[in-house]
Amino acid sequence: FSYGGSATTNNSNSDGTNVTISNSKITTTGDNAGGIMTTGGGKTTANNLTINTSGTSSAAIRSDRGGGTVTVNKGTYTTVGTGSPSIYSTADITVNNATLVSKASEGIVIEGKNKVTINNTKLTDSNTKLNGQSTTYKNIFLYQSMSGDASTGTAEFTSKNSDIVTNNGDTFYVTNTTATINLTNNKITNNDSKGNFLRVQKDSWGNSGSNGGDVTLNMTNQEADGNIVIDSISTLTMNLKEKSSFTGKINSENSAKSIKLVLDKTSKIK
């Protein structure tokens, strides 16, 4: 547990708390029992850990109000409980060369003006149980809950040279926030025949009529397939470059508030 001393700010006014843990095994069985926790602007470095959590609201890599900075190198991080993603971010979290497994919850959740970056990492998600206000199954979830745990702003997910597997629901889901998704040279698989590549729409959070999403999707040397669904209060800007390709339907119901597609001469949409 790393607490930086500030309950209201992310990475500012911290007291400099810095926790490093290496080559360890962490197992939790209770509810609200995450594997590693960072809050209040603290800093955590985790090297080659094996984390298993089985309770509800028990993310393997977890942050809370005030956020901080988390760097994870190698290891395996597994959750089986409801509302327990492999990563829950109200911080700036980077994961390198690791394995992330979520069996009941979303794989990664990013709340508000916070970030998750994965490099050379395998993420496998099954999301078999809905939790709280959730109405859809998904793997990577970017949103603003309005609880006060995270500042309002752009939620950001970046993945490079990684393997992303979705077994139930949408690969990416965005609601009630502005979001940026950066994808470079990943293998992205959705095994759910009804799952979308990306869904952006209103949901249970925020004020009705203004609680959709505004998404910028950047693809670099990236292949992807599936459908993209954008509702009437949401927007998408999609940038493809360096031999990127997307195969699937985009806004097939013609419902989006706006969609902008930008392709360089080496990229294509099929």
Regions found by a protein language model. Give the residues of each.
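Surface-exposed loop/turn motifs in large extracellular/passenger domains
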Residues: F1-T29, M37-S57, R62-T82, I87-A104, ...
